């Protein structure tokens, strides 16, 4: 790694000493950001580059055990992982393909951007991971989807 990063190697090592960033992304298919902030059961801080992304204190709370999580009001996702789907210019009516889609972080955001129009095809090579992907897509209320797991062997 030192060879690859060169003079940035020391900064790379320092990042492991920093506290972890916990994030969640509001499902705008089910609730507006404004309405979610009114009912949020814990303090949230905005992720500056993601309009529906927020930081939370993961050392103090467990949002994966809250009823809002099971209602599909938000998706737990590291803030930097929110960026790719956010930056794609997806419009309602588009046809979108997400390969290596499990567990569904990008797919749920892409599906929300479609606003019930167009089609989202989410694919993963692993059947077990595809089950989690489909669960998350269902939780998010994405109706215009095609889920698929490839059964082809790698190697």
Positions of PLM-derived features:
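S-adenosylmethionine
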Residues: 1-154
